[in-house]
Design a protein with these regions (language model features):
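C-terminal helix-coil-helix/basic helical segment that borders enzyme active sites and/or dimer interfaces
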Residues: 26-37, 277-278, 282, 304-337, ...
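A short core secondary-structure module
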Residues: 155, 159-203
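Amphipathic, small/basic residue-rich leader segments at the start of a protein or domain
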Residues: 1-102, 123, 395-401
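A short, Trp-centered hydrophobic/proline-enriched beta-strand micro-motif
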Residues: 126-135
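Short Gly/Pro-enriched turn/cap motifs at secondary-structure boundaries
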Residues: 101, 137-140, 164-166, 183, ...
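Glycine-rich beta->alpha junctions and the first turn(s) of the following alpha-helix
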Residues: 2-15, 204-307, 374, 399-401
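A structural signal for short hydrophobic beta-strand segments in well-ordered beta-sheet cores
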Residues: 149-150
């Protein structure tokens, strides 16, 4: 039976994350929104602090879905994946861009946690890993990746271009998706760890963005980039039956984390909007029936219901990961729901607060800009719906066209 009760130790760590969001992120949030591509030096010590909170699941995808070293038992666990979504939501209540910029907490770390061997995990421990999947000609079609990996003796040779790599300039490692054989389709797609400073790896440019400006977004070029053979994550074997399930398993961890990012930003907007409306005498405290409520109160109730639904889906996906239950469909469900809800909530909060909400006097306009990325990266709304349909109907993407 599903258990979404939050253990006491996870509540404590989430409370610490909230304190960081309030005391460290909020005061510098606007500064780095305006100073895009400037590294927030205030975060230098924070990565080390969060490493110390690892038992509470402070890392993105900290436990991984497929930890084969765990013995199966009948215990109902709420562990590090649950801790991850709780902490990420709290940190993003402070600032989503700054959360993405915390050293050692990159989306690539989740890929390593999901499919790396114990030796690889030890070798890459403590290093900040970004994720390089998207390409100019592929977009959301991950199966159409053109970046290649060719085995030459005891080295892989990588060639290709990756775009929209979050923290691609600042990270220590880049987890690159590449194909071993284009003719084999998606089954040949694997993920590789490339260390910064490796000859042939180049950060070509940084992009200007609508939101999350505290984090850098890079274009990365790979030109005969050679890495050790044991930097491949997962098996070298091309298994047509398994397709690229090993590489895709990463998303089972990162999508609930992205959903948590959306929850944090939406909660920030809701909290501030409630506070502003309360000052105007609109309390929205569930003391009257809906038909007797102020129109604005009804909007608040609707948004809070949407937020709570997204939160429960996210907690369920995390709970499934903690209990070694396949959660691909639920990871997509929570990501789709939370991303869309965050977009709707933050924009509605701007609207409810009128000119004040639209101005830079408040953070509402920034949160509306920041929230949009949660509906795009790690798979767009349309991609999530396609995945959910595939799982529910038992059909391939081609059959659903």
């Amino acid at each position: 039976m599903i258990n979404l009760e939050i253990p006491k130790h996870l509540k404590g760590v989430a409370s610490m994350a909230h304190d960081i969001a309030q005391g460290m992120f909020r005061p510098i949030s606007r500064k780095y929104d305006k100073a895009e591509h400037t590294y927030p030096s205030e975060l230098d010590t924070l990565g080390a602090i969060l490493q110390g909170l690892d038992e509470g699941g402070s890392q993105l995808g900290a436990d991984g879905l497929s930890r084969k070293d765990k013995k199966k038992d009948n215990k109902n666990r709420n562990g590090r994946n649950m801790g991850t979504v709780l902490n990420v939501a709290e940190l993003c209540w402070g600032d989503l861009g700054l959360m993405l910029t915390i050293p050692g907490q990159g989306l690539g770390n989740a890929a390593i946690a999901a499919v790396a061997t114990p030796e690889q995990k030890e070798r890459f421990q403590g290093k900040w890993a970004s994720m390089a999947i998207t390409e100019p000609g592929a977009g959301s079609d991950s199966a159409n990746i053109q970046t290649t990996a060719r085995l030459d003796g005891e080295e892989w040779v990588l060639n290709g271009e990756k775009i929209y790599v979050t923290c691609g300039e600042r990270s220590d490692l880049v987890v690159v998706w590449a194909t071993l054989d284009k003719a084999q389709g998606r089954a040949a797609i694997k993920s590789f760890v490339v260390e910064k400073g490796t000859p042939g790896l180049e950060v070509a440019r940084l992009d200007k963005k609508l939101g999350i400006r505290a984090s850098d977004t890079a274009t990365i070029l790979l030109n005969d980039c050679r890495i050790p053979r044991n930097n491949l994550l997962g098996s070298e074997e091309i298994d047509v039956k398994k397709s690229f399930a090993g590489a895709m398993k990463t998303f089972d961890n990162t999508r609930p984390a992205v959903a948590a990012m959306a929850l944090g930003v939406a909660k920030a907007a809701l909290d501030l909007t409630r506070e502003l409306l309360r000052k105007e005498g609109i309390k929205a405290e569930y003391q009257e029936s809906l038909y007797e409520s102020h129109t604005i109160e009804a909007e608040i109730y609707r948004m809070e219901a949407e937020w709570e639904a997204a939160r429960l889906l996210t907690l369920k996906a995390a709970w499934m990961a903690d209990n070694n239950i396949p959660n691909s469909m639920h990871a997509s469900m929570c990501k789709a729901k939370a991303g869309k809800s965050a977009n709707d909530i933050t924009l509605k909060c701007v609207e409810l607060c009128g000119g004040l909400g639209y101005s830079e006097e408040l953070m509402l306009e920034k949160w509306a800009r920041d929230s949009k990325i949660t509906d795009i990266f790690e798979g767009t709304q349309q991609i999530q719906r396609l995945i959910i349909a595939r799982q529910l109907l038992g059909k391939s993407s081609k059959e659903l066209r």
